[in-house]
């Protein structure tokens, strides 16, 4: 009989040790059911997401002979003062200006394949080298004028590169040939 008492005591001791190391569940968060909730009964069907009455003033961009090229292409041609303002913004952000030109297609086109690829008009010819260290917007504008003079039937765009992140940050058309 003594052996059975010792045996049950050993089991009880072992059971108490395991229970002492257990962690109680966290009960610090309260249920949201105890908080009062006020809900607005919205039975008005006109409050469903819509564009309201603005449907009549939306227009579709006419795709025939009015292609979009780059950023700001929906605006009229930029004047020299407006170009200087954009170039100053580019320089103020610490981006490196670079000029590119395209003599045949100033827009994305696909002649080699139906799906997008490397040769679909996104890559233009670089005008000289990127203007590293340029701090004067008039220097960039002078290069635009020189590119226009050399290639009067070409599109000229200004690009701003961030040489720290190594990405293109801005790109806009500075000159379009007559008729575009």
From Swiss-Prot:
<keyword id="KW-0809">Transit peptide</keyword>
<dbReference type="GO" id="GO:0051607">
    <property type="term" value="P:defense response to virus"/>
</dbReference>
<keyword id="KW-0602">Photosynthesis</keyword>
<keyword id="KW-0965">Cell junction</keyword>
<dbReference type="InterPro" id="IPR036385">
    <property type="entry name" value="RuBisCO_ssu_sf"/>
</dbReference>
<dbReference type="GO" id="GO:0016984">
    <property type="term" value="F:ribulose-bisphosphate carboxylase activity"/>
</dbReference>
<comment type="similarity">
    <text>Belongs to the RuBisCO small chain family.</text>
</comment>
<feature type="transit peptide" description="Chloroplast">
    <location>
        <begin position="1"/>
        <end position="56"/>
    </location>
</feature>
<dbReference type="InterPro" id="IPR024681">
    <property type="entry name" value="RuBisCO_ssu"/>
</dbReference>
<keyword id="KW-0150">Chloroplast</keyword>
<dbReference type="Pfam" id="PF12338">
    <property type="entry name" value="RbcS"/>
</dbReference>
<comment type="subunit">
    <text>(Microbial infection) Binds to tobamovirus movement protein; this interaction seems required for viral systemic movement.</text>
</comment>
<keyword id="KW-0113">Calvin cycle</keyword>
<comment type="subunit">
    <text>Heterohexadecamer of 8 large and 8 small subunits.</text>
</comment>
<keyword id="KW-0601">Photorespiration</keyword>
<dbReference type="Pfam" id="PF00101">
    <property type="entry name" value="RuBisCO_small"/>
</dbReference>
<keyword id="KW-0945">Host-virus interaction</keyword>
<dbReference type="GO" id="GO:0019253">
    <property type="term" value="P:reductive pentose-phosphate cycle"/>
</dbReference>
<protein>
    <recommendedName>
        <fullName>Ribulose bisphosphate carboxylase small subunit, chloroplastic 4</fullName>
    </recommendedName>
</protein>
<keyword id="KW-0120">Carbon dioxide fixation</keyword>
<comment type="function">
    <text>RuBisCO catalyzes two reactions: the carboxylation of D-ribulose 1,5-bisphosphate, the primary event in carbon dioxide fixation, as well as the oxidative fragmentation of the pentose substrate. Both reactions occur simultaneously and in competition at the same active site. Although the small subunit is not catalytic it is essential for maximal activity. Involved in antiviral defenses.</text>
</comment>
<dbReference type="InterPro" id="IPR000894">
    <property type="entry name" value="RuBisCO_ssu_dom"/>
</dbReference>
<dbReference type="InterPro" id="IPR024680">
    <property type="entry name" value="RuBisCO_ssu_N"/>
</dbReference>
<keyword id="KW-0051">Antiviral defense</keyword>
<keyword id="KW-0934">Plastid</keyword>
<dbReference type="GO" id="GO:0009853">
    <property type="term" value="P:photorespiration"/>
</dbReference>
<dbReference type="GO" id="GO:0009507">
    <property type="term" value="C:chloroplast"/>
</dbReference>
<dbReference type="GO" id="GO:0009506">
    <property type="term" value="C:plasmodesma"/>
</dbReference>
């Amino acid at each position: 009989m003594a052996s059975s008492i010792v045996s049950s005591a050993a089991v009880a001791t072992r059971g108490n040790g395991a229970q002492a190391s257990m962690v109680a569940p966290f009960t610090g968060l309260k249920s949201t059911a105890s908080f009062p909730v006020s809900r607005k009964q919205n039975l008005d069907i006109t409050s469903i997401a819509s564009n309201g009455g603005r449907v009549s003033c939306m227009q579709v961009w006419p795709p025939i002979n009015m292609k979009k090229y780059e950023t700001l292409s929906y605006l009229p041609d930029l004047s020299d003062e407006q170009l200087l303002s954009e170039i100053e913004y580019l320089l103020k952000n610490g981006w490196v200006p670079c000029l590119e030109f395209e003599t045949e297609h100033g827009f994305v086109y696909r002649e080699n394949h139906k799906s997008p690829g490397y040769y679909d008009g996104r890559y233009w010819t670089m005008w000289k080298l990127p203007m590293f260290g340029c701090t004067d917007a008039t220097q960039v504008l002078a290069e635009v004028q020189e590119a226009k003079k050399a290639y009067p039937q070409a599109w000229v765009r200004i690009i701003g590169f961030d040489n720290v992140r190594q990405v293109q940050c801005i790109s806009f058309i500075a000159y379009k040939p007559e008729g575009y």
